[in-house]
Amino acid sequence: MKHTLLKSVALLAASTAVLAACSNSDSSTSSSSAASESKELTIYIDQGYETYINDVKADFEKENDVTVKVKTGDALTGLDNLSLDNQSGSAPDVMMAPYDRVGSLGSEGQLSELTLADSSKTDDTTTALVTNDGKVYGSPAVIETLVLYYNKDLVSAAPKTFAELEELAKDSKYAFEGETGKTTAFLADWTNFYYTYGLLAGYGGYVFGDNGTNPEDIGLANDGAVKAIEYAKTWYEKWPQGLQDSTASNNLINTQFTEGKAAAIIEGPWKAASYKEAGVNYGVATIPTLPNGDNYAAFGGGKAWVVPTGSKNTELAQKFVDYLTSTDQQKALYDATNEIPANTEAREYAVSKNDELTTAVIDQFASAQPMPNISEMGSVWTPAGNMLFEAASGAKDAKTAATDAVKAITDEIAQKHSN
């Protein structure tokens, strides 16, 4: 009996040892598998960044013993699909997002919180662009803002003030064919709120109070904003009627400029390639000083690196984002794409290249204001655009147009965001 009991104990001990060994083996295999999975990162980007990422990823892969897989596609489509991709487990680890999408996606739980590395050398404007309710959801990569393009064959130097633009408008060589008394000397797409905001802000208007975070305080009908709208109306009295058509005005402006009929226009850096292709002998400068002596305070824009909440390795993704926003990699981004780096040290490098467009954007960005990145901003665009059209067309005076726009924005926010 004793022998049988000892034998049973021995067998039990042996079985336990075998099970433990199997368990340890399974655990080891599982850990090995997890480690293997954690050593791969997927980055989703527009095709225009593919060469840049492939050129710079090797050092990161070597230093971190990781493989960076590059997938290309339309960035906005990728962001639109992020909710489903996060849920299904198919979200990439790193993406690029326009600043105006970062805050809302973060507040919706689609983006992971990030830490801005000291090496990213961000400034107050770019930091604000990736921050929502005190939380950082992206790391600034690229900056953009509106600038002044001018035709060097028509004017010898960039106009410095709006008073100079007004003088150009008196020159008969800029008379618009088909509409007596109308000029194309200077053109701006001011029925598009993105383009108009710099004028309004330069006079003291604003979208939301508390640096764009308080949707209960809308500053588009204050005294400064109304004065700006009244000034815009003086230009619409000079411009062809087609400038009032928000669906066709941008095309009209660019056609007049590329055909050599407009001396100066307000546009973004993304238009430079098409002007070059059209053979325009253009220059680029900061937007002229407003009649009140202040700067045109356009929206600051651009793109940030973000990490979806569905990332399988957020820690390594954060590390890759830090790598991409470091000074050396931001210099490489500029060299590869000519897009202006958010990193302030890399910006200095970009300026040293003596490129007119780069210098103008960086100088203008100093006066730029962060576009509010709270979700309520989506309720602003249509009413604010209507505000300028109604004032420009004479349907309403400036004060009424502004007051009505603020009411429309307030009502829509209440409807969409009421608790």
Which residues make up each language-model segment?
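Conserved N-terminal structural module of periplasmic/extracytoplasmic solute-binding proteins
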Residues: K2-S15, S23-R101, P291-G293, L316, ...
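A structural signal for short loop-to-beta-strand junctions that line the ligand-binding cleft
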Residues: D85, P92-D93, S119-D153, T184-A188, ...
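Hinge/lid segment of periplasmic solute-binding proteins
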Residues: Y99-L146, A157, F162-E166, E177-T180, ...
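Extracytoplasmic/periplasmic solute-binding protein
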Residues: Y137-A141, L146, E166-I218, A262
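Conserved C-terminal helix/tail region of periplasmic/extracytoplasmic solute-binding proteins
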Residues: A366-N419
